[in-house]
Every structure is written in structure tokens, then in C-alpha cells.
Amino acid sequence: MTLAVKCPILGFEETKNMEFSTIDEVFVRLKSLDGKDFSFVLINPYLIRPDYEFDIPTYYQELLSLTPESNMKIFNIVAIAKSIEESTVNFLAPVVINLDNNTMAQVILDTVNYPDFFQADQIANYIKK
């Protein structure tokens, strides 16, 4: 599915369209469609952190035309390491997708309001051993 980027991923401001695809039951991929060959691996945060909760700021709600009835998905960017346990998740800047109009935005959360969210939180912190 092609997504229109309404608020880009930090550092990739020139990207306006991305392809969304499922890798498996845990991970998905966002791939640039604007001539640059790069992609991001994302994770459904609720699979590893069921208590993950935040309010989407009004600015982003309007940008994505979100309503309480919107078919919306939340994902977080993963920095892949040699092992999945060493890989990190950015809980401070989730990617919000509105499936009703195929738009997406990276939402930057305020660290003051979300002191337990980090940019590089190891997946190992959330895997039960």
C-alpha cells in the first residue's frame, strides 16, 4: 500500500511517498518511493509493550484527518542489530498511519510528557525470559 507522507521521518524530509508492506506478524516495512533507495523496519509496539499509550497531538490529528472512528495503526521504528534482543525501538517518535486515507506521519512526542519513552530502547527490555 502506498502512503502519502504528511509529516516526514526525521532526517528524511524530502520523502513524500512510502510503500507499506508486512514482513511478518511482528514487523512491517516502510520503503521510500521517491527515487532514494532506503527503507525502515517498524514494529507493532503493543506486541512488546502492551502499556504503550500516548495522546496524538491535535496538529497530527488534523494533518492525518484522524477522527475517533478512523482506522489507524501505530508503529515504531526499529534499529536492527546483530540480535533481536540488541535491536532498539524508538518509542518517542511513533509512526501513525491513517488507513482510511493512506496517510502517515512520524509523531514527535515531548519527553516531558513521556519520560518513560526513549529513542533507542532495547527490545530485550520487553522480552520475557
UniProtKB/Swiss-Prot annotation:
**One short Pfam family name for this protein?**
FliW
Q: Name one GO cellular component term.
A: cytoplasm
Alphabetized UniProt keyword annotations:
Bacterial flagellum biogenesis, Chaperone, Cytoplasm, Translation regulation
- Origin, by domain of life? Bacteria
GO BP annotations, alphabetical order: bacterial-type flagellum assembly; regulation of translation
- In the UniProt record, does the keyword Iron occur? no
InterPro entries (UniProt xref): Flagellar_assembly_factor_FliW, Flagellar_assmbl_FliW_dom_sf
| Cellular localisation | Cytoplasm
Q: What does this protein do?
A: Acts as an anti-CsrA protein, binds CsrA and prevents it from repressing translation of its target genes, one of which is flagellin. Binds to flagellin and participates in the assembly of the flagellum.
Quaternary data: Interacts with translational regulator CsrA and flagellin(s).
Spell out the family assignment given in the record's similarity comment.
Belongs to the FliW family.
Give the protein's recorded name: Flagellar assembly factor FliW
Lineage here is: Bacteria, Pseudomonadati, Campylobacterota, Epsilonproteobacteria, Campylobacterales
Gene (UniProt)? fliW
